[in-house]
UniProtKB/Swiss-Prot annotation:
Localization per Swiss-Prot or TrEMBL: Plastid, Chloroplast
GO molecular function: endonuclease activity
GO BP field: chloroplast mRNA processing; Group II intron splicing; photosystem I assembly; tRNA splicing, via endonucleolytic cleavage and ligation
SUPFAM superfamilies: HCP-like, Homing endonucleases
Pfam families xref list: LAGLIDADG_2, PPR
PROSITE patterns with a match to the protein in the record: PPR
Gene disruption phenotype: Can grow only in vitro on sucrose-containing medium under low light conditions. Mutant plants show a pale-green phenotype, very slow growth and delayed development.
Stretch forming the transit peptide: 1-68
Function: Promotes the splicing of group II introns in chloroplasts. Required for the splicing of intron 2 of plastid ycf3 transcripts, a factor required for the assembly of photosystem I (PSI). Involved in the splicing of several other group-IIa introns. May be involved in the splicing of precursor forms of trnL, trnG, trnI, and trnA. Required for the assembly of PSI and PSII.
Lineage, highest ranks first: Eukaryota, Viridiplantae, Streptophyta, Embryophyta, Tracheophyta
Organism: Arabidopsis thaliana
Gene3D superfamilies registered for this protein in UniProt: Homing endonucleases (3.10.28.10), Tetratricopeptide repeat domain (1.25.40.10)
Annotated protein name in UniProt: Pentatricopeptide repeat-containing protein At2g15820, chloroplastic
């Protein structure tokens, strides 16, 4: 029923229906409403939607929205997608009778393996480029948003004109709020709304939020919505949350979109298909932000398993391309997700494009344990679909067969690659070298390496690494030395992996003098690394040069970038015990007890005898679990920088999640140091070899971390403790800076922080107590504390003794600032982008933009 007389313009839509066409009615306020006609015949032909309830959420120039929902467990609710053109709001809806099953990853998607780097040297053909753009364009997925089928519809919805409100004062105040709210920042906006608490109702706040969305002030609309949810009169509004989430998602505000999305889930409701679709696209549009791909996969999986939806082909393809394009990775998660996407495309009857087959074969070939059967199955399906195998597929096959050591299959695949007449990528030569190394034919491997040099005009870095590794295993000393010299002269980097292989070979052959020369050359041309130090230390202890071994050990211990490990301690301890140096052995033993390193069983027997003479008891087990002072200070800095704590409230235990960024130079160095410092606290599965420490590992679950969980992660969210000023030592500040700080191009220092505004103020005051002035801005949920000029120099002077040696040059502020440390001039910090906070929200010393 619709009335357009300007005094009682109310529209109520009920029932579940198939929207087939629409017409427009103009109200007296000159706003145009798009009203949808119903295809009644579809109800009888489609019994699945007879019990469905429906919702239409309309956005008018001045329209008040009231949402009444009636819930039925068996009914499907969907909000129709709409777009705004000028003064007209159009709604698009496509009926659908299909009921998709809940899918889980099939058995073929659960194979183990690791995801490795992309093929190098492969250039796409024009055909390949066009195909890649066709199957993986995020823009195509974004364009499909408006065409997403809507199968969850609310029961009843009412749209009223602003003029229909009986109280004139309410109309005036609402109009005034609609004008004022978009002009204010977050804190002032909340104060403004709080001042209206006495008269504002949910319908009023909903109207303001929708008005903000209509004028494209979506973040302001979100703030009004968030304020509304904190009021005691608030009732969940599915229509409003759906509209808000989709508007935020279309602007790529994935964090706020996810908050609203989670609000729907927390109410026991299933978001609409369009909301799922938009949120996935928002994440895929921000892949440069860490963790967005994982979140996109999580939402995609929920879309299918929880919502029972069948996504558009463009969404499948976009997510698949993002998985294939991801650099690096751990375990076989990417393969499982890719198999799940492939399974969904096939079972829903969508077209499987050529690049999907190619990408899936490529992912399988990257695994440590290759499933040749699955690869052959995909090849058969690819042929049935009428696709020819491209160069990328053939190279993937070459890699897979090389890992299995199948020389015959490699040669046959090599001929196929030659027949394609599209050039041989350098990585194909590396795979062929690996295949022959598996069968011990190093002469053939060397021949292939020389062919690569002729074919591409010089060997690649990966080619040098592979051939040197192969020849070191068969101990071809002269040939290895010749190749290493060529490698150094070529100027290619990194050299460290090859130096480590050569050092191992020299140690096995007993060529300790050559090993020492290789060690010295490595330090001159590469950054210091614990693996090469450990090999050199083993060599010194084996030849009995314990004095020099002690010096090298002390150098490792004093350099936080290298640090000592259980292996280096056991190596030196064995040397001291074999030579009868009991005093030095006791010192190493005490160090191992302090660091809680395990002592090798043969050494325990010797220690037991030596210490029994002095009536000392050998501690078979480490001390009771307790963090040292240094560990506590490091943990405070890391927690401020974003370290996460996962809690099990039932068992009252907590687990630290150590996570590092692969694309951060500071994190590459820092993860080694953190792994060594917290080794005794790490989960047994996290005790990896020194040279393959992952970018993510966990501590053991322990009640000792309860203090940190209570103060830094209450209720599973980051928070800043009230007593942070007591715990903010220079050591903690240094690790905070190394973990999440940034040095700008101008040499200023910016620190990243999550928590409440009050907590940030406490941190700012703590810095001011150390004579450092700072400015703060907020972006999303993250605060950025900036120190510029003299302030950055003072900060650096405070933390420099605790910064890892290899990071000092990388993190050191501008030299001009250091020259002016003694000047007391106050520096002003200007973050160019505006924040969500106004200047009046904090004290006068630390300004929030």
């Amino acid at each position: 029923m619709t009335k357009s007389n300007g005094h009682n313009a109310t529209m109520i839509v009920t029932g579940a229906c198939d929207f087939s066409s629409s017409f427009s009615l103009a109200s007296s306020s000159s706003s145009t409403v798009s009203v949808t006609t119903f295809n009644i015949s579809s109800l009888s032909s489609n019994p699945n939607i007879i019990n469905s309830s429906s919702t239409l959420f309309r956005s008018l120039s001045f329209s008040l929205i009231r949402h009444r929902s009636s819930y039925s467990r068996r009914s499907l609710r969907r909000l129709s997608i709409h777009t705004v053109h000028g003064n007209k709001t159009q709604f698009f809806s496509h009926s659908s009778t299909r009921t998709p099953p809940l899918f889980t990853a099939n058995s073929t998607a659960q194979r183990s393996g690791t995801f490795v780097e992309h093929l190098t040297g492969i250039t796409e053909s024009e055909e390949g480029i066009s195909e890649a753009n066709g199957f993986g364009d995020v823009e195509s997925a974004r364009n499909d948003i408006r065409n997403v089928a809507t199968r969850r519809i609310e029961t009843e919805f009412e749209v009223r004109e602003l003029e229909e409100l009986p109280e004139e004062w309410r109309r005036s105040k609402l109009a005034w709020l609609c004008k004022e709210v978009p002009t204010h920042k977050a804190v002032t906006l909340v104060r403004l709304l709080n001042a209206q608490k006495k008269w504002v109702r949910q319908e009023d706040a909903t109207y303001i939020s929708v008005h903000c969305m209509r004028i494209r002030e979506n973040e302001t609309g979100f703030r009004v919505y968030r304020w509304m949810t904190q009021q005691n009169w608030y009732r969940f509004d599915f229509g409003l949350t759906t509209k808000l989430a989709e508007y935020l998602g279309k602007e790529r505000k994935f964090t706020k979109c996810r908050e609203v999305f989670d609000d729907v889930l927390n109410q026991g409701r299933v978001p609409s298909e369009s909301t799922f679709h938009i949120l996935v696209v928002a994440y895929l549009s921000s892949l440069s932000v860490e963790g967005c791909l994982e979140e996109a996969c999580s939402v995609y999986n929920r879309m299918i398993q929880l919502g029972g939806y069948k996504p558009r082909l463009s969404l499948h393809n976009s997510l698949f391309r993002a998985l294939v394009s991801k650099q690096g990775g751990i375990l076989n998660d990417q393969l499982k997700q890719a198999e799940f996407i492939f399974h969904n495309v096939v079972t829903t009857g969508l077209e499987v494009q050529k690049d999907i087959y190619s990408g899936l074969i490529w992912l399988h070939s990257c695994q440590d344990e290759v499933d040749i059967g699955r690869i052959n199955s995909l090849r058969e399906e690819m042929k049935k679909a009428g696709f020819q195998e491209s160069k990328e597929v053939v190279v993937s096959l070459l890699r897979a067969y090389a890992k299995e050591g199948g020389v015959e299959e490699v040669e046959r695949t090599w001929l196929e690659l030659l027949d394609l007449d599209c050039g041989i990528p350098s990585q194909a030569f590396v795979y062929k070298i690996e295949a022959y190394s598996k069968v011990g034919d190093f002469a053939k491997a060397m021949e292939i390496f020389r062919e690569m040099e002729k074919h591409i005009g010089g060997a690649t870095m990966s080619g040098y690494h592979k051939i040197i590794e192969v020849l070191c295993k068969v101990q071809q000393v002269e040939l290895v030395e010749t190749l290493m010299k060529e490698f150094e002269e070529s100027g290619k980097k990194p050299l460290l992996p090859s130096f480590i292989e050569i050092a191992k070979m020299y140690f096995d052959l007993g060529l300790h003098e050559k090993l020492e020369m290789a060690f010295v050359q490595c330090l001159e041309k590469c950054q210091p690394s614990q693996p090469i130090y450990n090999i050199y230390l083993d060599s010194l202890t084996k030849i009995g040069n314990l004095e020099k071994a002690g010096d090298v050990f002390n150098e490792m211990k004093n350099n936080g970038t290298i640090n000592v490990s259980a292996r280096s301690c056991n190596s030196l301890l064995k040397g001291y015990l074999d030579c009868g140096k009991q005093v030095q052995a006791e010192r190493i033993y005490d160090l191992m007890r302090m660091k809680k390193y395990e002592i090798e069983p043969p050494l325990m027997e010797k220690l037991d005898y030596i210490l029994s003479l002095k009536k000392k008891e050998v501690k078979k087990r480490p001390f009771s679990m307790k963090l040292s002072k240094d560990q506590r200070e490091v943990l405070v800095g890391l927690l401020l920088g974003g370290l996460q704590i996962e809690s099990d409230k039932e068992k009252k235990s907590h687990m630290i999640k150590f996570e590092f960024r692969e694309n951060s130079q500071a994190h590459l160095v820092l993860k080694q140091n953190i792994h060594d410092q917290f080794r005794e606290w790490l989960h047994p599965l996290s005790n990896f070899q020194e040279d393959i420490i992952p970018f993510e590992f966990y501590s053991v679950p322990h009640s000792y971390f309860g203090f940190y969980a209570e103060h830094y992660w209450p209720k599973g969210q980051p928070e800043i403790p009230k007593l942070i000023h007591r715990w903010l030592s220079p050591h903690s500040l240094a690790y905070w800076y190394m973990y999440s700080g940034v040095k700008t191009s101008s040499g200023d220092i910016i620190l990243r922080l999550k928590g409440s505004l009050e907590g940030v103020e406490k941190v700012v005051k703590a810095l001011q107590a150390k004579s450092m002035e700072c400015r703060v801005k907020k972006k999303g949920k993250v605060f950025w504390i900036g120190l510029q000029g003299t302030n950055s120099a003072l900060f650096w002077k405070l933390i420099e003794p605790h910064v890892l040696e290899n990071l000092k040059e990388h993190l050191k502020p501008a030299s001009e600032s250091l020259d002016n440390v003694k000047e007391a001039e106050e520096q002003s910090i200007n973050f160019k982008s505006n924040s969500d906070h106004s200047d009046d929200c904090v004290n006068s010393e630390a300004h929030f933009y």
